[in-house]
Structures are given as structure tokens and as C-alpha cells.
């Protein structure tokens, strides 16, 4: 997520997607950055504007059983469901005048929501940059690939954490690597057939112990498939047992280091969290969480589906108290201790394959 708003990446996105910018959005962007800066200086949360980047969860259902994912491994305790199109549109109507980017995933497989392409199209028509992440199992026909392209989706991540079925299924439990390969091929061909530049296709490879030797071959597969980017990402774990099983032996591909206190995220402790100023997480039922690391919405800020409510939520007591707490001592929040946001390190690396 962070690389999208990094200083090196942002100018490229501004040039490519000039359509998403307006004076109102630019003013909001500047307001957010200024309030963030002031907050860091005075050590007290000041909030101007609203988040310029939104994360929206279309569904928290998933077809796979990935062992490190709360949705797949069954550890997620919150109710499951799909975001309704009506609630979604009302939320977009309220927030799109000032926000310019929508990351359309969280827990679950977005394309299990049958309205997903229509959701993307609605956001696109509102001038939002749209981005999603998928396990690639629902691009089964040429018509489905064309629907994705025609929706106006700007960018898509397709997860492919292996080069053969034996390796792939060790993490993507219940998945079929050939379906993913075929789906990516269909999407590349659909773009060519329709003469479309988007969506840009990212092939994502999460590095784990069982696949760490396949990175170069996976990149070659990405080139052969004709995708736009190859994304290498480190794995997030939640227990020592998971660490022993999944973290790569090659230290440069791990986001953690071992200490006397156990596993900790590499790098110097980070003060505060900028995400709490520029982004917000809206789950399928409208529950607003501070970010995507709050898997079970333990820190519910309010409901985005109550008409005109988001402005009050964004500056409400719950959000402000949480910002104050994180600004004072980020390590005091459990989920923040396992978060790489703001740290300098190789947590993800994007290689451009096509200009």
C-alpha cells in the first residue's frame, strides 16, 4: 500500500491518471498533508480534510484457505457478508469529491461479490483511481476478462506465490495455479483486444520458506505472461509456529528479525502512523476501522453507511483518541507492533516490466 503514495511513485501516477485530480481534491490533499505535519510537530492530532485514499472491502468471503489469512484460516471472528451496491454508491457519493484513490479489497476475494465490476465502474465514473487484489480464480471466461477491462479498473494485483501446483498449494490452499495462469492470460488478451491500457496487471509473489528459490522463475513467468509489473512481497506472520513454517531462511526476504522479546518488524521504531491521516478502512457492512491491519474491527470508529456520517466519524472522539494513542506510543497497540507501515525496509518491491 505504502509504495503507491511514496515520493518516487506518486509523480508517475499523477502523470498517468491526471483525470482523477480536481481543485477540490488537490486542496484536500494539501490540507491532509499540512495537518499531518502539524500533528507531528506539536505531538497532538490535528485533522484537516478527509482521507484522500480509501480502502473498501467488497466482501470478506474467500474461496481459498490461506493459512496466514484470518479469512482463510477461520480465525476472523466478525460476521461475513457482501457490501450492497446501494450502500456502496451512497458512500462513494459522499466521499468521492475529496478522495481520489480507492483500494477495493481487504479480507476476502473481491470477485465473489457479484456487483464488484459495477462497483468499480461507479467509482471510475466518479473520477476515482481504482485498484484491487485477487487470487485470480474468477477470470474463467473471455467475457469475464472483458468485463474487468470495461469496468474501468486502473490496476489489479494477481497473487501467484509459486511456479507449479505443488509449491503454490502449500499456501494458496484449495487453489489451482493453472486457473490463475489462464485468468492472467485472458486478462492480457482482453486488454489487447479492446485496445485498453488498463488495468495495469501486477503479478504478486509473497516470499515464503517453500518458494524462496522460485523468485527469478516467477519473474520470468510474469514477463512471459505479458503483465505490467512483478511485485515481490514479504510475508506477515502472527505466531512463532507460523514463523518457523513460513518465513524464508533468506533474511533479506523477511520483514522480521529475532530478538529476546521474539519476532519484531525490522527497522527503528516508528513514531505515529501517517495512515491515520490519509486513509480509512470501510468494511463490507460499513464498519469503519483505522486501517486494514484491524482484521476484526477491534477499533470500530463508526458506520460509513449512515448518511453524511463520515465527516463526523473522521473527526470524532474514537478516531481522535486512537490517533493520539498511536502518536504517543505506537508500540502500545497490538496490531501496530506487527505492521510495517512507515518502516524502511524491503517489505515489498515492485519491478516495472512494461512502460
Indicate where each model-derived feature is located.
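Local cysteine-cluster metal-coordination motifs and their immediate loop/turn environment
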Residues: 63-71, 290-293, 334-342
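Processing junctions and N-termini across compartments
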Residues: 56, 60-63, 267, 330-333
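Radical SAM enzyme [4Fe-4S]-AdoMet core and its adjacent flexible, acidic
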Residues: 1-16, 78-86, 126-129, 147-312, ...
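Short, charged low-complexity linear segments at domain edges
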Residues: 31-51, 303-324
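Short, basic and Ser/Thr-rich N-terminal targeting/leader segments
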Residues: 52, 275-276, 332
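Generic structural signal for residues positioned in beta-strands
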Residues: 53, 202, 300, 335-338
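Conserved alpha-helical substructure of the radical SAM core
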Residues: 3-155, 170, 174-178, 182, ...
Amino acid at each position: 500500500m505504502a509504495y503507491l503514495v511514496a515520493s518516487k511513485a506518486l509523480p508517475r501516477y499523477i502523470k498517468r491518471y491526471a483525470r482523477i485530480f480536481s481543485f477540490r481534491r488537490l486542496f484536500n490533499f494539501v490540507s491532509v498533508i499540512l495537518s499531518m505535519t502539524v500533528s507531528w510537530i506539536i505531538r497532538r492530532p490535528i485533522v484537516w480534510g478527509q482521507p484522500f485514499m480509501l480502502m473498501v472491502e467488497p466482501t470478506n468471503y474467500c474461496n481459498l484457505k490461506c493459512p496466514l489469512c484470518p479469512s482463510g484460516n477461520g480465525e476472523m471472528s466478525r460476521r461475513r457478508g457482501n457490501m450492497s451496491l446501494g450502500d456502496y454508491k451512497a458512500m462513494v457519493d459522499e466521499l468521492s469529491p475529496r478522495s481520489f484513490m480507492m483500494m477495493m479489497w481487504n479480507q476476502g476475494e473481491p470477485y465473489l461479490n457479484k456487483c464488484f465490476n459495477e462497483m468499480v465502474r461507479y467509482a471510475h465514473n466518479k473520477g476515482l483511481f481504482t485498484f484491487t487484489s485477487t487470487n485470480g480464480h474468477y477470470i474463467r471466461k473471455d467475457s469475464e476478462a472483458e468485463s474487468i477491462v470495461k469496468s474501468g479498473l486502473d490496476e489489479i494485483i494477481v497473487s501467484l506465490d509459486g511456479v507449479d501446483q505443488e509449491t503454490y498449494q502449500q499456501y494458496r490452499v484449495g487453489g489451482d495455479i493453472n486457473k490463475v495462469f489462464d485468468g492472467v492470460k485472458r486478462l492480457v488478451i482482453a486488454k489487447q483486444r479492446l485496445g485498453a491500457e488498463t488495468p495495469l496487471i501486477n503479478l504478486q509473489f509473497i516470499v515464503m520458506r517453500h518458494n524462496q528459490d522460485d523468485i527469478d522463475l516467477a519473474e520470468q513467468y510474469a514477463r512471459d505472461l505479458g503483465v505490467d509489473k512483478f511485485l515481490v512481497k514479504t510475508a506477515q506472520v502472527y505466531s512463532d509456529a507460523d514463523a518457523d513454517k513460513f518465513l524464508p531462511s533468506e533474511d533479506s526476504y523477511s520483514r522480521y528479525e529475532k530478538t529476546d522479546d521474539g519476532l519484531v518488524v525490522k527497522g527503528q521504531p516508528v513514531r505515529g502512523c501517517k495512515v491515520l491521516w490519509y486513509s480509512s478502512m470501510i468494511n463490507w457492512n460499513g464498519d469503519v476501522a483505522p486501517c486494514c491491519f484491524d482484521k476484526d474491527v477491534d477499533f470500530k470508529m463508526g458506520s460509513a453507511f449512515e448518511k453524511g456520517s463520515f465527516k463526523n466519524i473522521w473527526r470524532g472522539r474514537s478516531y481522535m483518541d486512537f490517533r493520539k494513542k498511536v502518536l504517543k506510543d505506537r508500540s502500545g497497540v497490538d496490531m501496530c507492533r506487527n505492521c510495517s507501515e512507515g518502516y524502511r525496509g524491503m517489505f515489498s518491491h515492485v519491478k516495472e516490466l512494461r512502460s
